[in-house]
Amino acid sequence: LVITGRKKMEEDLITAKEKAEESNRLKSAFLANMSHEIRTPLNAIVGFSSILADAEEPEEKEEYINIIENNNTLLLQLVGDILELSKIESGTLEFVFSDLDLNALFKEIEESAQLRQKNEAVPIRYIPEMPDCTVNIERNRLTQVMTNMLNNAMKFTYSGSITFGYRLKDTDFLYFYVTDTGCGIEEDKKDTVFGRFVKLDSFSQGTGLGLSICQSVVENLGGSVGVESEPGKGSTFWFTLP
């Protein structure tokens, strides 16, 4: 019995050591990625600011200003996403629940997304599927997740449309979704899209943190996330909340 107890203690210590080492490895990888991701827009801002000072043609100046503005937006988004992740990691993410008219909120989300959409060839539409629906839910976090998923759809949809909405699933869960007619995702890549700093298209702008934050927020609210996709036809990102 003494030997068995000692053996179990040794196994527990080995397991704890392996978990600690894996945690340190993930933190190191996170910091390395974060350093690279911050440096990229900063270099563009600094570099094109210097070039802008010497530019003479109005068209040339406008081009450099647009590049600087885009990288300013990217840097701000990156810092915001990192701050959100730090709250999630430390367990200090705040949740304030209130009674909410979902149809009214989704109309607001639709209007906001339409204002952000730069590609006029891809309309964004909210599809109401339920009559008046008032639920006790976390407004800010629901808006955050829907906005992140819509932003992701905008980046990869060049023609067609983007639709979103919600419906009752079974009797205990609400099912929320964003469907696009974008490039789609290969089967072997689906499991990676919710990882940190994952960008399936290295040329697309973004932090690679948005979907990871979505997953963390939804799981903190007791739900789950997923994606259904077909290459060349589009994707549906979804999540459920109790």
Annotated model-derived regions:
Residues 86-97:
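Helix-loop junction within the histidine kinase core
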Residues 27:
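Short basic (Lys/Arg) and small-residue
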Residues 185-197, 237:
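Short conserved segment of the HATPase_c
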Residues 210, 214:
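Short alpha-helical Gxxx[C/S/T] motif in the catalytic ATP-binding
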Residues 70-75:
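Short alpha-helical segment of the dimerization/phosphotransfer core of two-component systems
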